A protein has these predicted regions:
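Catalytic cores of RNA-modifying enzymes
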Residues: 1-116
Length: 116
């Protein structure tokens, strides 16, 4: 599996610290029955911990190279890896209007747009 290089034009900075990824995933567990949407999974470092729990996880990634990598790394998650631009998504359609937890190692370039 060929690693993906971060693309500066997308503001990518991949999470590589496994302990930080585990801590983020553990923080999401405060809402164990609510599905999770991960923004910008990159190479799936956080994703690998999110999918350990018995809950629905979806990941949205704009970079087609990262999407292909994620398909290979997480074949069972393939239908839940969304190759889209998060900022243009209709979030009501992601989980059919249900409440969900938003997490991720957000691309710096869009972090303010995500939260505001």
């Amino acid at each position: 599996m060929k690693l993906v290089k971060p693309k500066k034009n997308l503001g990518q900075h991949f999470l590589t610290d496994l302990s930080i990824a585990r801590q983020i995933a553990d923080t999401v567990d405060v809402c164990p029955d609510i599905p999770v949407l991960e923004i910008g999974p990159g190479m799936g470092v956080l994703t690998q911990y999110l999918v350990e729990k018995p809950r629905e996880v979806k990941a949205v990634e704009i970079d087609s190279e990262s999407v292909a990598f994620l398909y290979e790394k997480f074949p069972k998650l393939r239908e839940n890896i969304l190759g889209q631009d998060f900022l243009r998504m209709d979030l009501n359609e992601v989980f059919d209007g249900r409440q969900f937890v938003l997490t991720g190692n957000y691309p710096y370039d869009i972090s303010s747009q995500i939260f505001f």
